[in-house]
Amino acid sequence: MIRILIIEDDENKRTDIENVLERNGIHKPSYISHDNIQDGLNSLKEIKFDILILDLQLPQRSDSSPKEDGGVSILYKLSAVNFLTPTYIIGLTQYPALLEKYAEKFRSIDFNIFDYYNDDWAHAIKSKIEWIIASQKTHLIRQPDKDIYVLTHGIMTSGKWQDDLESKLKNKKPNIKIIKYTYPYYSAFQILFPFLHRKTIKNYERFVVNLTAQYPNATLNFISHSFGTYLTVNTLSSSDIERNASIGKIILCGSVLKSDYDMASLIEKCQPKLIVNECGIKDLPLVLCNTAVWGLGNAGRNGFYGYSPLLKNRFFDGGHSYFFTKSGFMDEYWLPFIFDDVFIECDGRKKTEANDLVQSLFSLLPHIIIPGCCIILLVLLVLNLF
């Protein structure tokens, strides 16, 4: 998690800085803002910040007048043993005279001052954030306060499996943190139209962002079924979660994602410990999903294409809810993976030429049925008009 401190007494400038951070995926409480020297120093005693964004002209306290060398006085104090020195310091001023006067002081400690009216400071912040994220991915040994497991169900269900899995996990480890994410019951008809579930997707993104804020030092693990896999993977792919949280194990089962989904980019972005994709080779709902629903697929039946050592497809001789209805499945496959990092291979597919032909025909259906329906609708519309 990146920690940034802003010490800036001008409200408009402070808002501009915060907006730059937000655009670069840094959200509260990853950054803290103060408008005076004293509050800033108090935070510097308690927290090791990655970046300090420092105005030059600052008041000692909120109710006092700004001092020309207020920001510079903080620099002098940072060498004391009772302060946690930030990794990077970015000076900022709207006064050219102060920029010229104190530029050498900042350069002497290998940092820079920027003119507020020049966009260079925003680019500098963006570059520092990207550098810190890259450094953390490469060198950070993750030692989170705790593991959190997020369980997300699919459509047309109340998610009973979430309760069953929670019970098994807590029997093994009573203090494990489990969060069962729920959303309104969706019918198969509702899932046909993307605009009907946009709010659910947005709510899930907000939930995960808030989770990273509430547990900034935890590792997030996800176990998702059916449409829940769509929520999980798209949130991790499209948001900036990895800037504020560590991602651990991900189990996807009965996934409605497309088999050619760009999982490689997700893995590169989030650096999960391992993604396991559980497939039911008799999952008929996914055949319909892949055929009739725009934007969805049957990765929970055919697996994800491509290769990554951090992505494993497992194939079972079962249907859409096989992973919950098959007696002992969770105990045999999930608990060893969750608690002991033991991944058990399984491939229940019948690799025959006839089966390959059937799979090829299934894969062609979306390219025939969806365009065909569109053509029929267009013809009906034309006939109705003329």
UniProtKB/Swiss-Prot annotation:
Broad class of where this protein is predominantly found: membrane
Keyword Hydrolase among UniProt keywords: yes
4-aspartylphosphate sites (modified residues): D55
Domain AB hydrolase-1: 127-284
Topology in membrane: Single-pass membrane protein
Species, as recorded: Enterobacter cloacae (strain JD6301)
CDD domains per UniProt: REC
Cellular location(s): Cell membrane
GO molecular function, a single term: hydrolase activity
Keywords from the UniProt entry: Antiviral defense, Cell membrane, Hydrolase, Membrane, Phosphoprotein, Transmembrane, Transmembrane helix, Two-component regulatory system
UniProt superkingdom: Bacteria
Free-text comment about domains: Has an N-terminal response-regulator domain, a central AB hydrolase domain and a C-terminal membrane domain.
Enzyme class: hydrolase
Full protein name: Detocs response regulatory AB hydrolase DtcC
Job of this protein: Probable response protein of the two-component regulatory system Detocs that confers resistance to bacteriophage. When the system (DtcA-DtcB-DtcC) is expressed in a susceptible E.coli (strain MG1655) it confers resistance to bacteriophages T2, T4, T5, T7, SECphi4, SECphi6 and SECphi27; the level of resistance varies, resistance to T2, T7 and SECphi4 is not very high.
Record EC number: 3.-.-.-
Stored Gene3D superfamilies: 3.40.50.2300, alpha/beta hydrolase
GO-annotated cellular components: plasma membrane
One GO BP annotation of this record: phosphorelay signal transduction system
Residue ranges of the TM segments: 362-382
Entry keyword Cell membrane: yes
Entry PTM: Probably phosphorylated by DtcA.
Description of how activity is regulated: The AB hydrolase domain is probably activated upon phosphorylation by DtcA.
Domain Response regulatory span(s) in chain numbering: 3-129
